[in-house]
Amino acid sequence: MRNYTYSLIKFFQKNWVYFLVFGLVFCYFASFRYLLIPSGDDYFWWGQPGDYLLHHGFVGPVKIYGASINGRYLGNFLEIFTMRHLKLALLIFAGSWTLMSWCMWKLENQTWWALILAVAFVFTLNDSLLNTVLVWNAGFINYVPPMALVLLYLVICKDGENKPLHKYYAILTLIIGLAAGLFLEVIAMAQIVMGLIIVFFFTKRKRGYHFSYLIGALVALVIMMSHPGYRMHIPYRETTFNPFKIWHIYVIANHIWLISLNTILIFLLLLAMTVIISRKRPYSFLDKLFIIVNNVFLIYYLIVGVYLKRVHNDNNYNYLLNPIFAQIDAIISLFLIIYTGYFICHYLSKQRKQVLFYYLCAGLYFGPLLFVASPVSSRSVFMSYVFMYLIMIDCVQTAFTGIKLQNFLFLIILLATLGIAGRYQMYLYENFNANLQRVLEPDYIQGKRLLNKHIPNRKFVWSKDRLDQQNVFYWRARLKK
């Protein structure tokens, strides 16, 4: 016992900085969640409809409950109880984002670059992902906790490649696979394929925890798909295998959310790729060609990023693009995806296998979305964005580690992260106070009219703070506490 305590003290002394960083990250997101303003579906699950579905196995009349009739048992359960219990909401929100940051850091070899970029992840989210995942409880619940669990499994797999793991890890991965598969249909299916890819192609040692994860994932898929809601005709849920319709949806929506809007990620990725090639000596003709192509992509996506800021988009971040531009941009996005894959295979030697796995996973979690005709939502690309971000971290570490400007570049990213983090908290605080003032207006709180004022920073409330998406009964109940 004494030796164990001594080892624990030594471990804390050696890693106290990391404990401090992730402790601050947890506190930041707890404060973040406290200041969030719920919207739309949050009130559906908080109120009588959510209570009815909870007590009827998430089954009910289609005309009333629509797509809420589903097998997302854990996601639905957490949405209901985080809306009813603020302390639980703070714990789940802060814990999930902190776990995701920690997993990214662990997967990227626990370097300082990995630490700052993992912490900065949420501040790189484009407006559509920010609005539908970060600042909306319903979006957060169904996307962030399961992805944090998927990344946790990958951390376990990586640790298992370097050292023997205790047999109890098999129980842990069984629980992870089961839990992660009860949030979203896409994750329930994709994590099984991901687990098989790891077993057959990306591990030297096949262990019990690999197979127990697969068992948990399979059980979760069976439980989810056994739900009667998937055998009902629900107009809101539609699939398509028509190649023209698939391409049309990719052109007008999916590629914009996946590629074009992610200016920060694309910029850092392409900049890192250019530096990686530039550090190679001597240059071949192919190297020079890649540098030119990199710079063309870089300039193009910076221009597109500025252009999209000026294009009108609705409350769901559907952009009203010029049809010709949308077609060209979609084609260029495919070239970028193919180009990135070739770059990984050709220029990344030490970490090629790991980055190639992320590349495949980004496609794996995006692929099923191509066949979804309705609902088409920006938050659906979140899982792929996570793996794209891991690719970027790998490339940035490879590019900037050891160069003369390393400390300067690190300082810039650190200051930018702290600045954006502070600004987000300021926006949320302004919104929180403005919302309190408007919901306390006598005519609203007495149910005589809807809200008639927007909060200052509308993108920090789901659907850009649509006034008809607030619920007077919720605010009456919350303000009484």
Predicted regions and their residues:
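Transmembrane catalytic cores of multi-pass membrane glycosyltransferases
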Residues: 32-84, 137, 185-193, 200-340, ...
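Membrane-interface transmembrane helices that cradle and orient dolichyl/undecaprenyl
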Residues: 150-169, 205
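Transmembrane alpha-helical segments of multipass membrane enzymes and assembly factors
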Residues: 100-116, 125, 137, 398
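Intrinsically disordered, polar/acidic, low-complexity terminal segments
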Residues: 3-67, 73-100, 108-113, 210, ...
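Membrane-interface micro-motifs in multi-pass membrane enzymes
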Residues: 120-158, 322-340, 365-392
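Alpha-helical transmembrane segments
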Residues: 14-29, 114-121, 171-175, 212-221, ...
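Signature aromatic-anchored transmembrane alpha helix within multi-pass, membrane-resident enzymes
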Residues: 288-296, 345-363, 398-423
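Transmembrane alpha-helix segments characteristic
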Residues: 116-124, 214-218, 285-309, 349-370
